[in-house]
């Protein structure tokens, strides 16, 4: 390869299980094969006493070196070590994940010593491999790329992916959403048409799942809504089959292979192969010689059995479809095309469930499900680097959206959304806040992402402080908060105090959020389910604030000597007693909004009576 630098950019689909790379020049997209001739490369990195292997070579020797072969790193990136999904995944991973300041690190033996790598570093190794595959074909050094992420990735996961790109030595021109990239591949390919239409992208990969509804007209691709599950894919279907095989092996041999990483890796590889076979045939046999403790393993699996083992997971993929249609306000009948993306959409049962959901509608299979995302990323890379010269990309415009609302925590840990979910990016939104205490000179701005009223049920993205601000009475300062989401879906927040002009900002990066999958997957549906709780939480907080504010005013009245003298004997005592009852009610954690309102009313009556009978 020459030292000359390629003036274009490559498109990389950085997948959980497999990755893919492509280029776009003129009007031609090329998916680039690796040295084995495959168009997809396993997202595996293996460490040995002598070397580091990436891709096919790493996956091929995973069974011999399970503790030092890392995969599934996309399920770690941008997450906290204490995330329940990380904990659950760790149970099945043969490699070691350790806690370092709340962040997960992969621990391996490499070149004779123990090394710890962050998920970003492992992802960067896969990106370097994809870059090298492209360089071998182009014959020049590649420095620029567009990388894809699941549409439902939060801010932490997006920023971490961008960081992985930087670690790999790539200038990441853009982070784009996988279903949007696939829509470009479809919209510019066989699905090209000037007619306006609603296209549903159903993207089920090895480890993540996205559904996006786009409106496509000419070269304008507008995402109307997006939903998904950042922790569901083909790997999970393999695991369900693997668990069935483990039980069958134990039943036949009375031996438990759960603790043997090598046996589990061999069995998982056989399960993945069986799953693929069952997409074409109706039955297959898993056969592994000397699987564990000298025992051979053989099991016949039918397609029906595989579908039964994954029944819940398969049906669950329809929930985000329902969510997307609801959010977009589009009826099933108004969906013109359903496009399948991701290797797992080859499973016949998945196709049947989806087609039945849309009343037997024919599914669109004209694009290669493994390559569509890289194809779209390459088109975007070509446009951004000036390599795309065709007429069909001249008017290409991508309008993507924020998958979950972004905002700040107010007094009482109430979530104040600044950018609602579904907002087209890039965007700039402003909202004004004020202080809660007299002479307050410091204001904290905790930033969250999610759909719940109570911030503790959303994802923390980090916080920053605005200080010092001029001391004023509570409620007087005007604090303007600006949320700016760029084309990569990455957030920058700025807060300014208007009189002094003092400002502070944060680009949310590496302040990794405590994201549990159950939160990100169910945030919207939970928000519906717990709406009553959320409303009660808000009402109680407002009632509490009102009562506290009124008590403060009454205290001012009775402590003012001129006003106090005007009160009849006994009236002041009545007010004080009523006020004590109200304060006691405030202390009770289980008080409802109504309880607090009643106490406020009683206190108002006591004050009114005392004043009117002077």
Curated annotation (Swiss-Prot):
PANTHER family found in the cross-reference section: HEAT SHOCK PROTEIN 70KDA (PTHR19375)
Record GO terms (molecular function): ATP binding; ATP hydrolysis activity; ATP-dependent protein folding chaperone; nuclear export signal receptor activity
List of residues binding ATP: 16-18, 74, 206-208, 272-279, 343
Disruption outcome: Impairs the translocation of HAT1 from the nucleus to the cytoplasm upon starvation.
GO cellular component, one term: cytosol
Substrate binding domain (SBD): annotated span: 404-614
EC number in record: 3.6.4.10
Enzyme superclass (EC): hydrolase
Reactions accelerated catalytically: ATP + H2O = ADP + phosphate + H(+)
Keyword hit for Hydrolase: yes
InterPro entries: ATPase_NBD (IPR043129), Heat_shock_70_CS (IPR018181), HSP70_C_sf (IPR029048), HSP70_peptide-bd_sf (IPR029047), Hsp_70_fam (IPR013126)
Protein name per Swiss-Prot or TrEMBL: Heat shock protein SSB1
Iron-sulfur keyword on record: no
Keywords: ATP-binding, Chaperone, Cytoplasm, Germination, Hydrolase, Nucleotide-binding, Nucleus, Stress response, Virulence
